[in-house]
Amino acid sequence: MAAIKYRLIKKDSRTNARLGILETPHGVIETPVFMPVGTQATVKAMTPEELKEIGATIILSNTYHLYLRPGHKIIEKAGGLHRFMNWDRAILTDSGGFQIFSLSSLRKIKEEGVEFRSHIDGSKHFFTPEKVIEIQNALGSDIIMSFDECAPYPADYEYVKNSMELTIKWAERGKKAHKNTEKQALFGIVQGGIYEDLRKECAQRLVEMDFPGYSIGGLSVGEPKNVMYDIVDLTTEYLPENKPRYLMGVGSPDDLIEGVIRGVDMFDCVLPTRIARNGTVFTSKGKLIVRDAPYAEDFSPLDEECDCYTCKNYSRAYIRHLFKANEILAARLATIHNLYFLIKLMERIREAIRQDRLLEFKKQFFKKYGYKEEY
């Protein structure tokens, strides 16, 4: 039996948006869905119970970081990642490809795999597609990723073509190495930079390999938004309708809406948790930097329209005070709010698809939030 099962429930009549159900070994997920990021087996500042309270059904964790610390063998001894971190809902792990790409000066790419130095202590390591599968098998996540090379932006055509070829070869090797297919679904990752022919070729060749789902990687790495949207549009066209599609590392409110319109089902991003720790929050009227002086005597909630724990109980003035005093609670309250905001946004998007009014929803949301409708 397959580890996951995707059911397409409804398609939007005027866009490529889809409403779906993704069944995993650790629960059923309504899509489109946003996945909070728990890089080191924790969503920063949140307990698993709090994540459940805000409606998170799946989180993301990171193969590269967990391999280096505490080590996948230790997590395996603990009974797997779910038990280790006390999270009984679904987990997706990424392959570490993006993290190694970020270490440009500390890595060497070969056909066999990638040699890199740990960002923690400088020790040498070697990742192959097989090794990455072995690590993720030990972690026991529900959805795992093929090892890929995330080409930088900008990069010339030849470099990206070679990088794409490598990603396809690695996907094949990873698929052969993956034995735990009944409990873990392996996704192929579509690369190809901003080159349409490469994206098309990569998608088609991965689809021939018949993965249970497909990721769109190598975007949101510095390219203009309209270019990213065009590539997503083009890529989803070549992906099967009966499999989930995951846009990696994308999670601002406008990107979530635009991604859904282009047929994406799953998203993840560190943005909501990272900006929360720096005192920036999402509101229905746009971003707000709560640590700024104007909020010193503002006793209204972060967002009048939000019913998260933070907004029901605390004022902007209080949260600003916590940030100014470097109190840990500041990051916790802002993180709870930001993740709740995005999870609620996805709920509203799903409802808009259900009612066939996603474009109207986008128009209203963008106008209120302060986005220009230029895409």
Swiss-Prot record:
Q: Which reaction does it catalyse?
A: 7-aminomethyl-7-carbaguanine + guanosine(34) in tRNA = 7-aminomethyl-7-carbaguanosine(34) in tRNA + guanine
Which interval of the chain is the signal sequence? none
Catalytic residues (UniProt)? D94 (proton acceptor), D268 (nucleophile)
Residues noted as binding substrate in the record, renumbered to the chain: D94, S95, G96, G97, F98, D148, Q191, G218
Q: How is the cofactor bound?
A: Binds 1 zinc ion per subunit.
User: Which residues lie within the region annotated RNA binding?
Assistant: 249-255, 273-277
Instruction: Detail the disulphide connectivity of this chain as listed in its UniProt entry.
Output: none
Q: Which residues bind Zn(2+)?
A: C306, C308, C311, H337
Protein EC: 2.4.2.29
Q: Which UniProt keywords apply?
A: Glycosyltransferase, Metal-binding, Queuosine biosynthesis, Transferase, tRNA processing, Zinc
Q: Kindly state a single biological-process term from the GO annotations of this entry.
A: queuosine biosynthetic process
Q: Which GO terms describe its molecular function?
A: metal ion binding; tRNA-guanosine(34) queuine transglycosylase activity
**InterPro entries for this protein:** ArchSynthase1/Queuine_TRR (IPR050076), TGT (IPR004803), TGT-like_sf (IPR036511), tRNA_ribo_trans-like (IPR002616)
Q: What GO terms fall under cellular component here?
A: cytosol
Cofactors that this protein relies on: Zn(2+)
Q: Specify the pathway.
A: tRNA modification; tRNA-queuosine biosynthesis
This chain's function reads: Catalyzes the base-exchange of a guanine (G) residue with the queuine precursor 7-aminomethyl-7-deazaguanine (PreQ1) at position 34 (anticodon wobble position) in tRNAs with GU(N) anticodons (tRNA-Asp, -Asn, -His and -Tyr). Catalysis occurs through a double-displacement mechanism. The nucleophile active site attacks the C1' of nucleotide 34 to detach the guanine base from the RNA, forming a covalent enzyme-RNA intermediate. The proton acceptor active site deprotonates the incoming PreQ1, allowing a nucleophilic attack on the C1' of the ribose to form the product.
Q: How does it assemble?
A: Homodimer. Within each dimer, one monomer is responsible for RNA recognition and catalysis, while the other monomer binds to the replacement base PreQ1.
Matching entries from HAMAP family are given as: Q_tRNA_Tgt (MF_00168)
State the family it belongs to. Belongs to the queuine tRNA-ribosyltransferase family.
This protein is called what?
Queuine tRNA-ribosyltransferase
Q: Which organism is it from?
A: Thermoanaerobacter sp. (strain X514)
